[in-house]
Amino acid sequence: MELKHKAAIVTGAGTGVGRATALALAERGCSVIVNYSRSREGAEATAREAAAFGVKAVAFQADVADDGACRALVAAAERELGRLDVLVNNAGTTRFIPHADLERVGDDDWNQIFAVNLKGPFQCARAARPLLERSGGGMIVNVSSVAGLVATGSSIPYCASKAALNNLTIALARVLAPRIRVNAVAPGFIAGEWLAQGLGAAYEPIKQAMEARAALHRVCTPQDVAAAILSLVTGSDLVTGHVLPCEGGMLIGS
């Protein structure tokens, strides 16, 4: 897909991977709705930076766990941008709970993680389908995780939600074809503020361990993941239903 004069929604775009993706799209001439749930200042800053590339960029608040908010998000894209070609389902959440501590996992953990990480992408895709089709077809990219492939990560509910998202990606690719392609990226450890806050003092030792484990001896940055997302958007039109690991070769080891 050629991105110039196209339009995109990126959820959770105030920080991290979402921010990097919104800016990468804008740099290539794609207007963008910069969605956020709580990170208003970050989203508005991202929108300003994206607009500096000469495209239209609008920050829009919506909690993807709420179906009505997802529909309002797509309506904003139609109102502000006039079309929709790309949906990047990046918004996500987790809890940092040791896997062996089963008693610490409560209903709220399951409900919130699945509401954002699984229902959110489904609801956004469902809401976006008509506008994507009216715009000539398009692309949905879900931001998953290697946690959904190997069941190691911040918590068991998080791993399960990403495994389910991988399955959802394949199901949506089947039912939305041939006009809409659906793929996912599965990052490994992503260096940055989100994991640093969640892991605290354990962040640097875990990061070093992940670097040592990866065949390429480094972990992801948000920009690495954004590049993987764009490779799916702008690459072969025959790729759909694919989950692309982006983890420096952690899955194959050194």
Question: Residues of each region from the PLM?
Answer:
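Alpha-helical segment proximal to the catalytic Tyr-Lys
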Residues: 130, 173-178
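Residue(s) in the substrate-gating loop at a strand-loop-helix junction
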Residues: 145
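Active-site helix of classical SDR
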Residues: 125, 161
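Substrate-binding pocket helix/loop in short-chain dehydrogenase/reductase
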Residues: 98-102, 106-111, 206, 210
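Conserved glycine-rich cofactor-binding loop
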Residues: 7, 14-16
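Short, small/polar-rich loop/turn modules that mediate ligand/substrate recognition or access, typified
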Residues: 177-181, 239-241
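Short C-terminal tail/terminal secondary-structure segment
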Residues: 94, 99, 150, 230, ...
